[in-house]
């Protein structure tokens, strides 16, 4: 019980503390040094190759896709990292992500349903990960108006209008199996009067 709680807390801390910086997804024609290096070589992206451990990447991808080259850039980076699970924030276009993931063999995806145009996506490697279920925490918390014109169900999570996305998955490498609850929290970066009150 304590080990499970420790794993759960570790995953929560990792997801909560992930960087929310902008994504350098406009590759342009060169790397800015004038040497026309392939922008998708990604020399600083590391595949740790840890076959006996769960590899999770969280990424505020910043309004995916931002540019015409975003899908190719992100796909190349994810393939280079070769992680088991990617928890992405600010998915502006589900269809673009679906197209990208469908071009990546052995990966699947799950989207949230309550975050609107800047939602969550869970992308995972089928070889190691089994998706069991998802839950959008506090998505049914009442609010005056959540902006969806459905006044019978004004259910806007009070924190930045983005309910945390909880996913229950099972990771297995054939030797060991780990059940994980992954919770993505998309913090609001900038305040205003209405958000500051919450």
Set out the residue ranges of the language-model regions:
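C-terminal motif of bacterial Sec signal peptides marking the signal peptidase cleavage site
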Residues: 15-18
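Sec-dependent signal peptide recognition
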Residues: 3-11
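Divalent cation-coordinating acidic motifs and surrounding scaffolds
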Residues: 24-198
